[in-house]
Amino acid sequence: MASLNENQKFWARVTELARQSIGKQAYDFFIEPAQLMSVEQDTANILLDSGMKKDYWKKQSDLITTAGFEVFGRMIDYELYANDELTDIELRRLNNQSPVDEPLSVAKPTSPLVSGLNEKYNFENFVQGPGNRWTLAAAIAVADKPGDTYNPLFIYGGAGLGKTHLMHAIGNQILTDNPTARIKYVSSENFVNDYVNATRKNQMESFENTYRNLDLLLLDDVQFFSDKEGTKNEFFNTFNALYDKGSQIVLTSDRIPQELNNLEDRLVSRFSWGLTTDITAPDYETRMAILLIKSESSHLEFPSETLSYIAGQIDSNVRELEGALNRVEFVARANGISIVDIETASQALRSLKNATQQSLSNLTIKKIQDEVANYYHISFSDLVGPKRPKEIAFPRQIAMYLVRELLGTSLPAIGTAFGGRDHTTVMYAYKQISDKMKNDMDVQKDIDSIKRKF
């Protein structure tokens, strides 16, 4: 076993090499939280804060090899462990050694080149939460090693959840690390327009030079891609040209690739070559964090209870949350209010609440039941019937939760609508789903997807 002093030197060298070879965002997310627990029999035991980061670390063997030869004078292998996967025995064994921590240096991003990027979107001002944590991790990994880690990166989710923010953040970070990088951000609609204009003006060579020689292509909202064969063929060829030369491709959509009915199977399959990851609606804590950050620049005072009230009123997406805060600010300034209380916020958001209520005015228990049954591929009779296997009981709880949440129906009335069940059963179902919504991303995603149907 290596001495503690040698271990410290070894880990210090690993982190130093990492800082020299990867971007700050990737270092902060993947390297900084990692801990060297011990070096035993020429194997470094490294503890990660999440098993999701193992794939990234498996590609960092050069760091370990180089540091091993420099400090120990021999080849050092490494074993990866994760806090969320460890057994008690492994944890006790690994904790016999103290981790080594290294401080980080902070690098300021530079201004982007003319490439369609918006410099205000970066990783630093992207608020992380349960609904976007792993997508953020993937974006950071892509920005650190474009064309290598996840290519293409396909991000999907509802409107206003931060997909475009992450696209620009990837581009801005890559441009910071490599100011000569050729980067283009473009919506699918503008890609189509560029192609149509090029064909009309007989400028296809210029079009191909623009798109096929990029280091990074950021294509937003691919669900709006044209049905025209010429456009799809051109993008297919552009995708292949970029992929073959190792350029990074990032795509966003409001749905998974397999649901993009306007695109050919050959394109859809390519979209799935890398990593497909989603963003769901922000939970309460994330909404509060967003409001705290945004309110700091308003020059008005927002007590925490006021922000909590706003966060409780808007649970759909970040864009609507920011819009609600802007509306509250406007009403406060118009009335000469410098300390924004709940009454002011309530007054400002009243019209928004009325609009939401209007959109749900035609919603019924039966419509919710039908939508949930359809989403989980079960029959209506099973949803409200006596069967209790998990594949039926869970959708039933989801449906009860949504009826209570969206319609405010009484517990006994909900029980009656679900086959005459007791109100305590409904109460239990509502609590179960409410608890899962706090930390289960799959449940959050299901609820968000079903809500969007309404």
Swiss-Prot record:
Domain II as annotated region, ranges: 77-115
Pfam families xrefs: Bac_DnaA (PF00308), Bac_DnaA_C (PF08299)
InterPro entries on file: AAA+_ATPase, Chromosome_initiator_DnaA, Chromosome_initiator_DnaA-like, Chromosome_initiator_DnaA_CS, DnaA_C, DnaA_dom, DnaA_N_sf, P-loop_NTPase
Subcellular location: Cytoplasm
Chain intervals for the UniProt region annotation (Domain IV, binds dsDNA): 333-454
One GO term of the biological process aspect: regulation of DNA replication
Chain residues that bind ATP: 160, 162-164
Region (Domain I, interacts with DnaA modulators): 1-77
Region named Domain III, AAA+ region: 116-332
Chain segments annotated as coiled-coil in the UniProt record: none
Cellular component terms (Gene Ontology): cytoplasm; plasma membrane
Major location (coarse): cytoplasm
Keywords, comma-separated and alphabetical: ATP-binding, Cytoplasm, DNA replication, DNA-binding, Lipid-binding, Nucleotide-binding
GO molecular function: ATP binding; ATP hydrolysis activity; DNA replication origin binding; lipid binding
Free-text comment on this protein's domains from its UniProt entry: Domain I is involved in oligomerization and binding regulators, domain II is flexibile and of varying length in different bacteria, domain III forms the AAA+ region, while domain IV binds dsDNA.
Family statement: Belongs to the DnaA family.
PANTHER family, A to Z: CHROMOSOMAL REPLICATION INITIATOR PROTEIN DNAA
Cited function: Plays an essential role in the initiation and regulation of chromosomal replication. ATP-DnaA binds to the origin of replication (oriC) to initiate formation of the DNA replication initiation complex once per cell cycle. Binds the DnaA box (a 9 base pair repeat at the origin) and separates the double-stranded (ds)DNA. Forms a right-handed helical filament on oriC DNA; dsDNA binds to the exterior of the filament while single-stranded (ss)DNA is stabiized in the filament's interior.
HAMAP family to which the protein is assigned, alphabetical: DnaA_bact
Assembly notes: Oligomerizes as a right-handed, spiral filament on DNA at oriC.
Name this polypeptide is given: Chromosomal replication initiator protein DnaA
Gene for this chain: dnaA
